[in-house]
Protein backbone atom coordinates (compact mmCIF):
# COMPACT_ATOMS: atom_id res chain seq x y z
CA UNK A 1 0.00 0.00 0.00
CA UNK A 2 2.89 2.30 0.90
CA UNK A 3 4.52 1.67 -2.49
CA UNK A 4 1.27 2.51 -4.31
CA UNK A 5 0.96 5.79 -2.41
CA UNK A 6 4.56 6.71 -3.29
CA UNK A 7 3.87 5.95 -6.95
CA UNK A 8 0.77 8.18 -6.95
CA UNK A 9 2.73 11.01 -5.29
CA UNK A 10 5.55 10.65 -7.83
CA UNK A 11 3.13 10.85 -10.77
CA UNK A 12 1.48 13.87 -9.17
CA UNK A 13 4.82 15.68 -8.93
CA UNK A 14 5.57 14.89 -12.58
CA UNK A 15 2.17 16.29 -13.59
CA UNK A 16 2.73 19.51 -11.64
CA UNK A 17 6.19 19.99 -13.17
CA UNK A 18 4.74 19.51 -16.65
CA UNK A 19 1.95 21.98 -15.97
CA UNK A 20 4.39 24.60 -14.71
CA UNK A 21 6.57 24.08 -17.74
CA UNK A 22 3.73 24.50 -20.22
CA UNK A 23 2.16 27.52 -18.57
CA UNK A 24 3.58 30.55 -16.87
CA UNK A 25 1.23 33.11 -15.33
CA UNK A 26 -1.64 31.36 -17.10
CA UNK A 27 -0.13 31.88 -20.55
CA UNK A 28 0.87 28.97 -22.75
CA UNK A 29 4.57 28.90 -23.50
CA UNK A 30 5.13 29.80 -27.17
CA UNK A 31 7.59 26.94 -27.68
CA UNK A 32 4.74 24.47 -27.05
CA UNK A 33 2.30 26.40 -29.23
CA UNK A 34 4.78 26.73 -32.08
CA UNK A 35 8.13 25.14 -31.42
CA UNK A 36 9.75 26.74 -34.45
CA UNK A 37 9.45 30.28 -33.06
CA UNK A 38 12.29 29.43 -30.69
CA UNK A 39 13.98 32.81 -31.01
CA UNK A 40 11.09 34.42 -29.15
CA UNK A 41 12.27 32.64 -26.03
CA UNK A 42 15.74 34.07 -26.60
CA UNK A 43 14.22 37.54 -26.74
CA UNK A 44 12.47 37.11 -23.40
CA UNK A 45 15.66 35.82 -21.77
CA UNK A 46 17.90 38.58 -23.12
CA UNK A 47 18.85 41.50 -20.86
CA UNK A 48 19.64 44.53 -23.08
CA UNK A 49 21.38 46.38 -20.24
CA UNK A 50 23.97 43.67 -19.56
CA UNK A 51 23.75 42.13 -23.05
CA UNK A 52 23.67 38.70 -21.41
CA UNK A 53 21.10 35.94 -21.21
CA UNK A 54 19.07 35.92 -18.00
CA UNK A 55 18.14 32.25 -18.43
CA UNK A 56 19.78 29.81 -16.02
CA UNK A 57 19.91 26.09 -16.72
CA UNK A 58 18.21 23.80 -14.23
CA UNK A 59 19.89 20.90 -12.40
CA UNK A 60 19.13 18.39 -15.15
CA UNK A 61 20.51 20.62 -17.90
CA UNK A 62 23.67 21.45 -15.92
CA UNK A 63 24.58 17.86 -15.05
CA UNK A 64 23.04 15.57 -17.64
CA UNK A 65 22.16 17.40 -20.85
CA UNK A 66 24.94 17.65 -23.43
CA UNK A 67 26.24 21.17 -24.11
CA UNK A 68 29.08 22.52 -26.19
CA UNK A 69 31.75 24.72 -24.63
CA UNK A 70 31.64 28.51 -24.67
CA UNK A 71 33.21 28.61 -28.13
CA UNK A 72 30.54 26.37 -29.59
CA UNK A 73 33.11 23.65 -30.33
CA UNK A 74 31.48 20.33 -31.03
CA UNK A 75 32.83 17.57 -33.25
CA UNK A 76 29.56 15.66 -33.52
CA UNK A 77 28.80 14.66 -37.09
CA UNK A 78 26.21 16.82 -38.89
CA UNK A 79 22.68 15.76 -39.68
CA UNK A 80 21.37 15.69 -43.23
CA UNK A 81 20.76 19.21 -44.57
CA UNK A 82 17.18 18.13 -45.31
CA UNK A 83 15.74 21.01 -47.32
CA UNK A 84 11.97 20.96 -47.67
CA UNK A 85 10.82 22.69 -50.83
CA UNK A 86 7.24 22.64 -52.04
CA UNK A 87 4.65 25.15 -53.18
CA UNK A 88 2.50 24.30 -50.16
CA UNK A 89 5.32 25.03 -47.71
CA UNK A 90 6.19 28.21 -49.58
CA UNK A 91 2.61 29.50 -49.37
CA UNK A 92 2.19 28.55 -45.72
CA UNK A 93 5.38 30.28 -44.60
CA UNK A 94 4.52 33.51 -46.45
CA UNK A 95 1.52 34.13 -44.21
CA UNK A 96 1.73 37.00 -41.69
CA UNK A 97 2.38 35.83 -38.12
CA UNK A 98 2.46 37.37 -34.66
CA UNK A 99 5.14 37.05 -31.98
CA UNK A 100 5.15 38.92 -28.70
CA UNK A 101 2.26 41.11 -29.79
CA UNK A 102 4.01 42.24 -32.98
CA UNK A 103 3.01 41.27 -36.52
CA UNK A 104 5.59 40.18 -39.10
CA UNK A 105 4.87 40.13 -42.83
CA UNK A 106 6.98 37.86 -45.08
CA UNK A 107 7.38 39.87 -48.24
CA UNK A 108 8.83 40.03 -51.76
CA UNK A 109 12.54 40.30 -52.38
CA UNK A 110 14.60 40.65 -55.54
CA UNK A 111 17.76 38.90 -56.66
CA UNK A 112 20.75 40.98 -55.57
CA UNK A 113 18.80 42.94 -52.96
CA UNK A 114 20.89 44.03 -49.95
CA UNK A 115 20.05 44.40 -46.26
CA UNK A 116 22.20 45.64 -43.37
CA UNK A 117 21.86 44.81 -39.68
CA UNK A 118 23.10 42.79 -36.71
CA UNK A 119 23.51 39.01 -36.94
CA UNK A 120 23.39 36.56 -34.05
CA UNK A 121 23.68 32.77 -33.99
CA UNK A 122 21.90 29.85 -32.35
CA UNK A 123 23.03 26.30 -31.76
CA UNK A 124 23.00 23.54 -29.12
CA UNK A 125 19.69 24.30 -27.43
CA UNK A 126 17.82 24.09 -30.75
CA UNK A 127 19.84 21.44 -32.58
CA UNK A 128 17.62 18.63 -33.96
CA UNK A 129 14.41 20.56 -33.23
CA UNK A 130 11.87 21.68 -35.83
CA UNK A 131 12.24 24.92 -37.75
CA UNK A 132 9.42 27.11 -39.06
CA UNK A 133 9.17 25.26 -42.37
CA UNK A 134 9.11 21.82 -40.74
CA UNK A 135 12.76 20.89 -41.24
CA UNK A 136 14.98 19.55 -38.47
CA UNK A 137 17.43 22.26 -37.44
CA UNK A 138 21.05 21.28 -37.98
CA UNK A 139 23.55 23.65 -36.40
CA UNK A 140 26.31 22.19 -38.59
CA UNK A 141 24.56 23.07 -41.86
CA UNK A 142 24.60 26.52 -43.47
CA UNK A 143 21.10 27.74 -42.66
CA UNK A 144 19.61 30.76 -40.92
CA UNK A 145 16.47 32.31 -39.47
CA UNK A 146 15.01 35.53 -40.86
CA UNK A 147 11.78 37.27 -39.91
CA UNK A 148 10.43 38.02 -43.40
CA UNK A 149 12.56 36.56 -46.24
CA UNK A 150 10.82 33.75 -48.19
CA UNK A 151 11.80 30.25 -47.09
CA UNK A 152 14.72 28.68 -48.98
CA UNK A 153 16.03 32.09 -50.05
CA UNK A 154 19.82 31.82 -50.46
CA UNK A 155 21.70 34.71 -48.88
CA UNK A 156 25.33 35.79 -48.79
CA UNK A 157 26.28 37.05 -45.32
CA UNK A 158 29.22 39.45 -45.05
CA UNK A 159 30.78 40.38 -41.71
CA UNK A 160 31.48 44.08 -42.34
CA UNK A 161 34.09 44.21 -39.56
CA UNK A 162 36.46 41.63 -41.07
CA UNK A 163 35.05 41.23 -44.63
CA UNK A 164 34.64 37.46 -44.22
CA UNK A 165 31.54 35.91 -45.75
CA UNK A 166 29.46 32.77 -46.00
CA UNK A 167 26.26 31.55 -47.66
CA UNK A 168 23.10 30.39 -45.93
CA UNK A 169 19.61 29.18 -46.79
CA UNK A 170 16.65 30.60 -44.87
CA UNK A 171 14.70 27.78 -43.20
CA UNK A 172 13.45 29.37 -39.97
CA UNK A 173 11.84 32.51 -38.53
CA UNK A 174 13.59 34.90 -36.12
CA UNK A 175 15.48 36.41 -34.41
CA UNK A 176 12.74 38.18 -32.46
CA UNK A 177 15.17 40.52 -30.72
CA UNK A 178 15.30 44.25 -31.38
CA UNK A 179 17.80 45.31 -34.07
CA UNK A 180 18.69 41.71 -35.07
CA UNK A 181 18.35 40.95 -38.78
CA UNK A 182 19.38 37.28 -39.03
CA UNK A 183 20.10 34.28 -36.78
CA UNK A 184 22.88 32.08 -38.21
CA UNK A 185 23.66 28.43 -37.63
CA UNK A 186 26.83 27.60 -35.72
CA UNK A 187 28.58 26.59 -38.95
CA UNK A 188 27.76 29.88 -40.67
CA UNK A 189 28.75 31.91 -37.61
CA UNK A 190 32.15 30.18 -37.60
CA UNK A 191 32.71 31.09 -41.24
CA UNK A 192 32.53 34.80 -40.44
CA UNK A 193 34.30 34.54 -37.06
CA UNK A 194 31.45 35.64 -34.80
CA UNK A 195 30.89 32.59 -32.57
CA UNK A 196 32.85 33.93 -29.61
CA UNK A 197 31.51 37.49 -29.84
CA UNK A 198 27.95 36.30 -30.41
CA UNK A 199 26.89 39.10 -32.77
CA UNK A 200 28.29 40.97 -35.76
CA UNK A 201 27.36 43.78 -38.12
CA UNK A 202 26.51 42.15 -41.45
CA UNK A 203 25.33 42.82 -44.96
CA UNK A 204 22.95 40.34 -46.60
CA UNK A 205 22.80 39.86 -50.37
CA UNK A 206 20.08 37.73 -51.97
CA UNK A 207 21.74 35.15 -54.27
CA UNK A 208 18.79 32.97 -55.21
CA UNK A 209 15.55 31.22 -54.29
CA UNK A 210 14.38 27.65 -53.73
CA UNK A 211 17.79 26.73 -52.30
CA UNK A 212 19.47 27.49 -55.66
CA UNK A 213 22.16 30.11 -56.28
CA UNK A 214 21.50 32.11 -59.44
CA UNK A 215 23.91 31.48 -62.34
CA UNK A 216 25.03 35.10 -62.33
CA UNK A 217 26.84 34.38 -59.04
CA UNK A 218 28.39 31.09 -60.20
CA UNK A 219 31.93 32.38 -60.84
CA UNK A 220 32.16 34.13 -57.48
CA UNK A 221 30.73 31.10 -55.67
CA UNK A 222 33.17 28.66 -57.29
CA UNK A 223 36.19 30.86 -56.61
CA UNK A 224 35.56 31.95 -53.05
CA UNK A 225 33.80 29.22 -51.11
CA UNK A 226 34.76 25.90 -49.54
CA UNK A 227 33.98 22.35 -50.62
CA UNK A 228 31.52 22.13 -47.72
CA UNK A 229 29.41 24.93 -49.15
CA UNK A 230 29.62 23.39 -52.63
CA UNK A 231 28.10 20.20 -51.19
CA UNK A 232 25.20 22.12 -49.65
CA UNK A 233 24.39 24.52 -52.49
CA UNK A 234 23.98 24.23 -56.22
CA UNK A 235 24.01 26.83 -58.98
CA UNK A 236 21.19 26.91 -61.49
CA UNK A 237 18.20 28.78 -62.84
CA UNK A 238 16.69 30.84 -60.05
CA UNK A 239 13.74 33.19 -60.10
CA UNK A 240 14.58 36.90 -60.24
CA UNK A 241 12.21 37.64 -57.39
CA UNK A 242 9.80 35.98 -55.01
CA UNK A 243 6.58 37.76 -54.11
CA UNK A 244 3.92 36.90 -51.60
CA UNK A 245 2.02 40.16 -52.05
CA UNK A 246 -1.71 40.10 -52.69
CA UNK A 247 -2.64 43.70 -51.87
CA UNK A 248 -1.56 47.08 -53.18
CA UNK A 249 -2.26 50.73 -52.32
CA UNK A 250 -2.86 53.72 -54.52
CA UNK A 251 -1.20 56.41 -52.42
CA UNK A 252 -2.08 59.35 -54.64
CA UNK A 253 -3.17 60.50 -58.11
CA UNK A 254 -1.52 63.49 -59.85
CA UNK A 255 -2.03 65.41 -63.06
CA UNK A 256 1.65 66.33 -62.88
CA UNK A 257 4.15 63.48 -63.37
CA UNK A 258 6.83 65.27 -61.34
CA UNK A 259 4.62 65.37 -58.25
CA UNK A 260 3.80 61.68 -58.58
CA UNK A 261 7.45 60.69 -59.02
CA UNK A 262 8.51 62.79 -56.02
CA UNK A 263 6.05 60.94 -53.77
CA UNK A 264 7.04 57.57 -55.25
CA UNK A 265 10.74 58.21 -54.64
CA UNK A 266 10.06 59.20 -51.02
CA UNK A 267 7.96 56.12 -50.32
CA UNK A 268 10.47 53.77 -51.97
CA UNK A 269 13.40 55.26 -50.03
CA UNK A 270 11.59 54.68 -46.74
CA UNK A 271 10.16 51.24 -47.57
CA UNK A 272 12.70 48.93 -49.22
CA UNK A 273 10.52 45.83 -48.78
CA UNK A 274 7.80 47.12 -51.10
CA UNK A 275 7.66 47.97 -54.78
CA UNK A 276 6.63 51.58 -55.52
CA UNK A 277 5.83 52.70 -59.06
CA UNK A 278 4.04 55.42 -61.01
CA UNK A 279 1.34 54.26 -63.46
CA UNK A 280 -0.44 56.52 -65.97
CA UNK A 281 -4.14 55.71 -66.19
CA UNK A 282 -7.33 57.72 -66.79
CA UNK A 283 -5.27 60.85 -67.48
CA UNK A 284 -3.67 60.68 -64.03
CA UNK A 285 -0.26 59.64 -62.71
CA UNK A 286 -1.01 57.18 -59.92
CA UNK A 287 1.49 56.21 -57.20
CA UNK A 288 1.14 52.50 -56.37
CA UNK A 289 2.73 50.56 -53.51
CA UNK A 290 2.77 46.78 -54.03
CA UNK A 291 3.82 43.72 -52.05
CA UNK A 292 1.51 43.67 -49.01
CA UNK A 293 0.84 40.21 -47.58
CA UNK A 294 -2.50 41.03 -45.99
CA UNK A 295 -5.15 43.70 -45.77
CA UNK A 296 -4.03 44.41 -42.20
CA UNK A 297 -0.46 45.07 -43.33
CA UNK A 298 -1.68 47.45 -46.04
CA UNK A 299 -3.92 49.31 -43.60
CA UNK A 300 -1.00 49.74 -41.19
CA UNK A 301 0.87 51.39 -44.06
CA UNK A 302 -2.13 53.65 -44.74
CA UNK A 303 -2.22 54.80 -41.11
CA UNK A 304 1.40 55.86 -41.38
CA UNK A 305 1.22 57.70 -44.72
CA UNK A 306 -2.29 58.35 -46.02
CA UNK A 307 -5.61 57.33 -44.48
CA UNK A 308 -7.35 58.05 -47.79
CA UNK A 309 -5.23 55.67 -49.88
CA UNK A 310 -7.14 53.21 -52.08
CA UNK A 311 -6.68 49.53 -51.19
CA UNK A 312 -6.87 47.01 -54.05
CA UNK A 313 -6.02 43.36 -54.70
CA UNK A 314 -3.10 42.70 -57.04
Swiss-Prot record:
Class in the EC hierarchy, top level: lyase
PROSITE patterns membership: PROKAR_LIPOPROTEIN, SPOR
Pfam families in the cross-refs: DPBB_1 (PF03330), SPOR (PF05036)
InterPro entries xrefs: RlpA, RlpA-like_DPBB, RlpA-like_sf, RplA, SPOR-like_dom, SPOR-like_sf
Residues in the signal sequence: 1-19
Recorded GO CC terms: plasma membrane
TM stretches of this protein: none
Membrane topology: Lipid-anchor
SUPFAM superfamilies: Barwin-like endoglucanases, Sporulation related repeat
Lipid anchor positions (N-palmitoyl cysteine): 20
Residue stretches making up the SPOR domain: 241-314
Superkingdom of this protein's organism: Bacteria
Residue numbers with lipid attached (S-diacylglycerol cysteine): 20
Localization: Cell membrane
Record-listed E.C. numbers: 4.2.2.-
BP-aspect Gene Ontology terms: cell wall organization; peptidoglycan metabolic process
GO MF entry, a single one: peptidoglycan binding
Keywords: Cell membrane, Cell wall biogenesis/degradation, Lipoprotein, Lyase, Membrane, Palmitate, Signal
Main function: Lytic transglycosylase with a strong preference for naked glycan strands that lack stem peptides.
Family as reported in the entry's similarity comment: Belongs to the RlpA family.
NCBIfam families, alphabetized: rlpA
HAMAP family recorded: RlpA
Listed name of the protein: Endolytic peptidoglycan transglycosylase RlpA
Organism from which the protein derives: Helicobacter pylori (strain J99 / ATCC 700824) (Campylobacter pylori J99)
Amino acid sequence: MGWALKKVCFLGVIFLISACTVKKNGVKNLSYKHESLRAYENAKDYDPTTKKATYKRNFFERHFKHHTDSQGNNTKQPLDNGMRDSNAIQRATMHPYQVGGKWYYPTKVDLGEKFDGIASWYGPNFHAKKTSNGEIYNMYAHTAAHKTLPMNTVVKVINVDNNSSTIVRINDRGPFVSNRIIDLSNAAARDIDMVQKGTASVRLIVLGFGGVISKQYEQSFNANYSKILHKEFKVGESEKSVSGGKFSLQMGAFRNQIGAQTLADKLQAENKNYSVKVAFKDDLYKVLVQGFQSEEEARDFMKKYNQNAVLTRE
